[in-house]
């Protein structure tokens, strides 16, 4: 098993997970890389490939992704590409990974011209979730991860949306009880799994999962993946989509009010005014979902 994680997650969970695997009879290759969007690229993947090749891993090997969404994307891409594909397992440790990115088989790395432009669909054999890992996350990471949860409530689940209106602060402060947290993660994972099952390769309904992401990804690219977490950029994107929908008359004023209020309670990052609108618009033209001109 190639156990792939980043430096931050390794400090918390690498040795317990590696030891557990060894006790179960697995040979474990520990692969630790710097992490972050700035290393989620072909150069970063090349470093992981080199370690797998040097260790002599063959097609019977598995890759285990231990960490957040970036680790899952990177390790999944490596698994999809190494020897034309080996099995992999997702062990997500952040909200965004547990409710969204670990489910559905999207893997990929960034290019200087856009986010996730190089990748493959490669389904994990297993997704193993331990919600206790969420309680060690800094608040900023929790807020960013909750962007995907709010998104699910908006696009698919009125009951979930109402739950978030009642308890969003409990979640971001991690004062929420264990049972409620387990329900929240399971509910969201179920939403993502249902959409993906209906449209694995994003030819139709799966596109709704990109709510707020077209503009969000463009903001990330326009700021060189250094200013905002992914979820923070999605918050901007969702608010922009709400404005566009309202202008087009497809979002009722009362729903718009609830929509914007929940995003603002989650927390809108600062500093976007310094980013040129044209730079953001230009990045949307390189979006992987773009059709035609």
Would you name each region that the model predicts?
Residues 168-227:
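Oxyanion-binding "anion nests"
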Residues 2-6, 147-150, 250-293:
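C-terminal charged capping/lid subdomain of soluble metabolic enzymes
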Residues 63-66, 70-84:
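A generic, well-ordered mixed alpha/beta core segment in the N-terminal half of proteins
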Residues 77-169:
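A glycine/threonine-rich phosphate-anchoring loop and its flanking beta-alpha core
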Residues 1-62:
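ATP/NTP phosphate-donor binding region
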Residues 12, 70-77, 98-99, 217-218:
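Short glycine/serine/threonine-rich phosphate/pyrophosphate-binding segments
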Residues 3, 41, 92, 130, ...:
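Residue-level signal for inorganic ion chemistry
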Residues 214-258:
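Internal helical hairpin/lid segments
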């Amino acid at each position: 098993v190639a156990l792939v994680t980043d430096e931050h997650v390794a400090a918390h969970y690498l040795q317990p997970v590696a030891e557990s695997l060894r006790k179960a009879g697995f040979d474990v290759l520990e692969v630790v890389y710097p992490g972050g969007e700035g290393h989620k690229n072909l150069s970063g993947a090349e470093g992981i490939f080199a370690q797998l090749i040097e260790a002599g891993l063959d097609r019977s090997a598995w890759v285990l992704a231990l960490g957040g969404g970036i680790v899952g994307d990177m390790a999944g891409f490596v698994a999809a590409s190494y020897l034309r594909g080996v099995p992999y397992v997702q062990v997500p440790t952040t909200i965004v990974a547990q409710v969204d990115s670990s489910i559905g088989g999207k893997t990929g790395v960034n290019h200087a011209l856009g986010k996730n432009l190089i990748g493959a669909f490669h389904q994990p054999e297993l997704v193993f979730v331990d919600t206790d890992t969420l309680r060690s996350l800094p608040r900023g990471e929790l807020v960013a991860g909750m962007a995907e949860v709010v998104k699910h409530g908006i696009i698919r689940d009125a009951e979930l949306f109402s739950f978030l209106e009642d308890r969003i602060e409990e979640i971001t402060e991690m004062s929420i009880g264990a049972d409620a947290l387990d329900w929240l993660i399971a509910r969201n994972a179920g939403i993502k799994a249902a959409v993906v099952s209906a449209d694995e390769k994003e030819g139709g309904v799966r596109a709704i999962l990109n709510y707020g992401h077209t503009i969000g990804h463009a903001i990330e690219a326009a700021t060189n993946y250094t200013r905002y977490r992914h979820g923070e950029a999605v918050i901007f994107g969702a608010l922009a989509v709400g404005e566009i929908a309202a202008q087009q008359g497809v979002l009722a004023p009362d729903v718009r009010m609830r929509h914007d209020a929940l995003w603002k309670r989650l927390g809108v990052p600062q500093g976007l005014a310094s980013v040129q609108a044209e730079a953001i618009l230009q990045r949307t033209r390189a979006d992987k979902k773009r059709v035609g001109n």
